[in-house]
Amino acid sequence: MAPPHKNHNFRPENVLKRAEDLIAVGQKEAALDTLYELIISKRIRYLQVQDLEPIASLLIELAVELRKGKLAKDALHQYKKNIQLSENGLESVQTIVRKFIDLAEKKLDAAQTKADIKIDEEENAAAAAAATSSAGAGGAGGDAGGAGAGGDDDLETAQTPESILLSAVSNTDSADRTERELVTPWLRFLWEAFRAVLDILRNNSKLEITYSAIVNQAFKFCLNFNRKAEFRRLCELLRTHMQSVTTQTTTKTSGHNAIDLSDAETVQRYLDQRFAQLNIAVKLELWQESFRSVDDVHSLITASKKAPKPNMMANYYENLARIFAVSDNTLYHAAAWNKFFNLYSQSPLATDEELKRYASVLVLSTLSIPQRVVQDVDEHKSKNSKLSSLLNLTHVPTREGLIKSILSRSILKYVDEPIQQLFELLEGGDFHPLSIKQEISQLFQIIESDKEFKKYIPTLTEVILIRIFQQVSQVYDAVKLDFLISLGIFPDLEYSLSELQVEDLIVNAVKDDLVSLTIDHESGVVSFKSNPFDEIDQEFANAGTTTTNTITTTTTIGTSRLQISPAELVRTQISKLAATLSESIYLIDPNYEARQQQAKQQALQRCIKDMVNEQQRIADRSKILKDRKVAAEKRKREEEERQARLRQEKLAMEQKLEQERLIAEQERKKLEKLEKERELIKENEKRKIAEEINAKGIIKIDLNNLKELDTTKLQLMQIEQLNKDKKELETKLQATAKKADHLERAYRRYELNLLEADLEIQLDLEKKDYEFLKQSKINKAKKDHDNAIELKKRLQRILPDYSKFKSEIDAKNEVKLKQLQKEAQIKFEKAKQERIESVKKHRIEELKIRKERERKAAAEEAARQAKAAEMAKLKEELRIQKEKDEALARKRAELEAAAAAAAAPSSSPPPKKTMTFAERMRLKREGKLP
């Protein structure tokens, strides 16, 4: 572990160098701890950002490499907190967090590549094994597709022991297992990195560009790896951030670098985020999250002062249409396509093919709106108003309104021919229930060929069958059940209802009050209501059993009637009678109109007379409402301020607790580090002693099992083993010595007789050897002497020539030798004289230096003696002066005592005065005191 920093080692360059040295020796965790301790220190607030940024960058690299996400998060929070007030502090924070995300993404890509390579190798090995065993086993197929990294497992849910055991013993695909082992940890790390970085960058106007970029990267991460659970959490996190921004704006409690939602660029940036969120939610098929995203987009659009771009709104309406399609809300699905087509048709980039396709979808979605009962329930009203506001509509859309919009804007000219024929067939007035079946089947066969149009056939079938049943009920009083069901079955279609499904549709139509009939299954007859008073009686019966919250139902049957039913005649009889009587009065009484005008004038005068009072009442009421509104707004504002204050206090408390936790964490880490270092030192000492013991070969100690042993115990073990070995060795030596002694005695006793015989043999051999060596030496000496005499005779012949040649050479070299000797003598004398001069000069210099030193020493001694004499003289003067002062003080005291005695005589003797030390010493010198 890295030792704690000292004050002299606090400089950033020293810390960075130490971390690099630790990395170089392979201690990356120690280097990470060293950098982390510097980053979380408060002293770095006074350092330059350019000095701290390399340290933070290296810390992030190590944290990503070692997968220390929590440490990186704490370090980034502290780094931002410490340098955010610096000149370029926030720019450095953006650089570091971007690097953090980029490194995490690179690690994830590397893990994915590694997993792909491993999966390919396993598949190749499995294919080879299958090929070798196919002759015997015939091969057994299986699914090769693993879940991969895009599984539905939750990255924030820790693995339980049961899940680990289950994954180990299960027969899951090896690709899935490889992905889970290699890719999932880095997926989890990258997700935690996104969360940490977004928390660091949130709600700061200078960081919002980087914040938006990281949000887009997080969206891409969720889309690329199909992370649905993480996408939901990401959306909730963004909503929380947005809520805090709006709360700060409304309560006016924004702090330094707060987000300004009145800025057009800021709002546009947030809109881009929400539109991206909506698109990803639709692609991931998270429809509830898509609807929440739509709500977020609509809230931002409403709050924005600047209208969003048309292409963004077109995308917004298109996604809304997809969401409504999933929720089976056909009415708002068609309304969304209507709004989308209005914008798309005005785009200069729109092509004829796209216009044709979108117009066909709009017409099909409009025709697919079923004819159901619209209930005026409060909850439905609020829901419809909410959906209408999302579509920027002022009222709830209707099927008739959408059809009128299609006709008024001539959208049918863009529509495909089969869909245009279907529209004319259903809305053009040529709807014949008994003959339309064949035409519908032909058109549906064409529509089914298109995958996007095909999904509207079920709802179109329901709409068409309901209209058929309604018009049959207007013509017939009773029909066979089989006949009615046969009208609802379209053969030769991919989507065709069965008899049971058609009957179920009829029952639901009766339940929704779209048609009135009864079914007699025993006789197989369907009877339509023919008594004009049946429905009226039923309405009165329902009115008698309902509560005050009566549900008024209206049949919205937008179809042409073949004839008026008896029930309709009864319902409209009174209204027709009233209209007829009114027309008769005009004809019978000519003054009726004049009386009506007079009554109107009188009523108008009364209204004018009461207008002033009514205006005053209205003014008073508006004032009361205004006061109430002001009071309510004040209460709301006070409550919001109180809530904001509580949130600020809570945030401050959390920050304080977090700071205390960080301090405690630092202390704990320091203590742990010290404890680990102590343990490491002890462990090293134990290991060193154990290695020494093992090297000596005294005992054998397992170096991997030293936890329960300490140095004292190891030394005791060594001493005990040495004592034991010593005792064993002494015992063995005694036994060996005793055995050797007995054996040696036996050997000597046995060989005594043999040695005497061997001695005689040895003497004979040695004598023979001596004679042989002696004769050999004599022969060799004679031979050498003869050779030497022969050599002398040969050399004697050349001796005169040698002497003559030597004399000549000596004569030639004698002159040269004398010259060289003379030159050498001259050089010697010269060097000798120079040496003498050098020695003289050196000795003279030494003499001068010695005399100078003696002179200085004599002067210093004289000065010292003079100073000592002066000090002695001064001391003597001080002593004399002190004695004079003492004598004077003594005389003064005697005079004062005498004066006091004279002034106050007393019978008692005067007290004896205590002498000072100086007086006693003076009297002793004078001999007056012993």
UniProtKB/Swiss-Prot annotation:
Gene3D superfamilies: 1.25.40.860, UVR domain (4.10.860.10)
Keywords: Coiled coil, Cytoplasm, Initiation factor, Protein biosynthesis, RNA-binding
Compartment annotation: Cytoplasm
Region feature (Disordered): 130-154
The encoding gene: RPG1A
Name assigned to this protein: Eukaryotic translation initiation factor 3 subunit A
Gene Ontology terms for molecular function: mRNA binding; translation initiation factor activity
One of the GO biological process terms: formation of cytoplasmic translation initiation complex
Family of the protein in this entry: Belongs to the eIF-3 subunit A family.
Subunit field text: Component of the eukaryotic translation initiation factor 3 (eIF-3) complex.
Coiled coil regions in record: 72-125, 620-902
Superkingdom, natural source: Eukaryota
Function description: RNA-binding component of the eukaryotic translation initiation factor 3 (eIF-3) complex, which is involved in protein synthesis of a specialized repertoire of mRNAs and, together with other initiation factors, stimulates binding of mRNA and methionyl-tRNAi to the 40S ribosome. The eIF-3 complex specifically targets and initiates translation of a subset of mRNAs involved in cell proliferation.
Species whose genome carries this gene: Candida albicans (strain SC5314 / ATCC MYA-2876) (Yeast)
Gene Ontology CC: cytoplasmic stress granule; eukaryotic 43S preinitiation complex; eukaryotic 48S preinitiation complex; eukaryotic translation initiation factor 3 complex, eIF3e; eukaryotic translation initiation factor 3 complex, eIF3m; multi-eIF complex
InterPro entries found in the cross-reference section: EIF3A, eIF3a_PCI_TPR-like, PCI_dom
Classification lineage: Eukaryota, Fungi, Dikarya, Ascomycota, Saccharomycotina
PCI domain sequence ranges: 355-533
Record's compositionally biased regions (Gly residues): 136-150
Keyword Protein biosynthesis in annotation: yes
Record bears the keyword Coiled coil: yes
